Amino acid sequence: MQTTKNQDDLVRIFKAILKEERFGSQSEIVAALQAEGFSNINQSKVSRMLSKFGAVRTRNAKQEMVYCLPAELGVPTAGSPLKNLVLDVDHNQAMIVVRTSPGAAQLIARLLDSIGKPEGILGTIAGDDTIFICPSSIQDIADTLETIKSLFNYAE
């Protein structure tokens, strides 16, 4: 067993361990990583990795609380280009809806609010991964939709 392994191996094995959905505490994850040869791993490092990869605690098939990676892909990072955070753009006769990666909606909404009325956006409401956009004019909603799509290089 090696005493140290590189960062890529650590990330790969960390994700594989979480996919097993059987570790209920950070100390159990530390022990599993140490058993895989990462002797310098500690609880603090595991805690940072859990945050970095968006791990959550949930119930597994045995109804035990365990750490796992969320099913959703595309958790935004500091280096994510904004266009990669927009997953879908759709509309009806009165409103435009933008779906984003989890956690990115408020960032994208702030950008849309900053371009505002000149581009046909009266205002936005953002949750975690969804933005409701109220156009300045319902008659011009198609133009506003195209502006938003072109801003994020979104093609259906």
UniProtKB/Swiss-Prot annotation:
The keyword Amino-acid biosynthesis applies. GO terms for molecular function: arginine binding; DNA binding; DNA-binding transcription factor activity. Keywords: Amino-acid biosynthesis, Arginine biosynthesis, Cytoplasm, DNA-binding, Repressor, Transcription, Transcription regulation. It comes from the Bacteria. Pathway: Amino-acid biosynthesis; L-arginine biosynthesis [regulation]. SUPFAM superfamilies: C-terminal domain of arginine repressor, Winged helix' DNA-binding domain. GO terms for biological process: L-arginine biosynthetic process; protein complex oligomerization; regulation of arginine biosynthetic process. Regulates arginine biosynthesis genes. Belongs to the ArgR family. This is Arginine repressor. It comes from Shewanella sp. (strain ANA-3).
